Amino acid sequence: MRVSISKSSVKGEVFAPSSKSYTHRAITLAALSNESIVRRPLLSADTLATIRASEMFGASVKREEENLIIHGFNGKPNVPDDVIDAANSGTTLRLMTAIAGLTDGITVLTGDSSLRTRPNGPLLKTLNQLGASACSTRGNEKAPLVVKGGLEGKKVSIEGSISSQFISALLIACPLAENSTTLSIIGKLKSRPYVDVTIEMLELAGVKIHTDENNGTKFIIPGKQKYDLKEYTIPGDFSSASYLLAAAAMTEGSEITVKNLFPSKQGDKLIIETLKQMGADITWDREAGIVTVRGGRKLKAVTFDAGATPDLVPTVAVLAAVAEGTSRIENAEHVRYKETDRLSALATELPKLGVKLKEEKDSLTITGGELKGAEVHGWDDHRIVMSLALAGMVAGNTTIDTTESVAISYPDFFEDMSNLGVKIKQISEE
């Protein structure tokens, strides 16, 4: 699908979509429990992949109004009767690969062409050390993956610099191992807030994880635990909301109120602080969960460390493109291992809109200026598409392709933007 975007501003109120990362974890922990209610889940392409995988392991998931009623398999996953297809979802693939280590048989997991390019080596290696048997069919650490159950607890270490999803997956599976597990992180743990979200959810499900007090890079996980997630309401998603907040900050005459943004462990709440640093007119009523942004102020350049919040990189890159001065997005090599190599995608597309940009191995240097309309490629990546849509609001006369990819995390993105006043036109494919 292609859309064209004209110069626009945004006005009005919008409810932030529910958090993708919390939804993935809530569904997974509910499947490992007996019976649970997950309230206000995000139902997107990625989270539907987690629902399908949970059902293949033996859970029953029913939708009732805005809730999911989940009858789980009580910590004993069945051997799936078919290949698990995680579609485009890295979280689904990684979490379910670890859960496959708890079965009495063999599980095969795969995904779409993009997911089959993403690395899984550290997770496979650690599962093998823990007594399961895990490999890639092509011997390249990428899906399709084959996992034979047999997970036992022991002392292991895992590389932390590629993806925090490997650590989250093991933190979820290891409490059901026969013995306790000690998991030590080697190197710098990237995207740490996502691990904190996992631990927060595990505690709510009655599962104990002891974190090493010094620097939080060692986890002691007692075995033979039981999951009991009763009921959980999914909070709003700061990653998805970042596009709404940035849209208002970037455009003259805009004023937007985004609801359902309460304080949480999400690292991407950093977008509020980043917008403040850049000089945006933004207020956050934490108790009410309401963020208000008024456009019109000239944004200033910023230095942004992407270590903990890789999903904000496309949003910050577009903010930098309209800010005064030269911004740097640093510590961002792990952003290359997402649905696409997002640093390369941004470095390819933003210059088409007139942006002066320098790409290095783990950074982008962006000098703000005037944007001009162009035809740009969305790279089949929801975050690239949504960030280019923001640039289009400023540049005008901008056409973006592969826009159907927003279904991964924010299915109503274009509808919400249109309701807020963005001039969007769908172009029929020839």
Curated annotation (Swiss-Prot):
Keyword Transport among UniProt keywords: no
Chaperone is among the record's keywords: no
Organism: Methanosarcina acetivorans (strain ATCC 35395 / DSM 2834 / JCM 12185 / C2A)
One GO CC term, this protein: cytoplasm
Compartments (UniProt record): Cytoplasm
Catalytic activity: 3-phosphoshikimate + phosphoenolpyruvate = 5-O-(1-carboxyvinyl)-3-phosphoshikimate + phosphate
Coiled-coil segments: none
Name this polypeptide is given: 3-phosphoshikimate 1-carboxyvinyltransferase
Gene name linked to the record: aroA
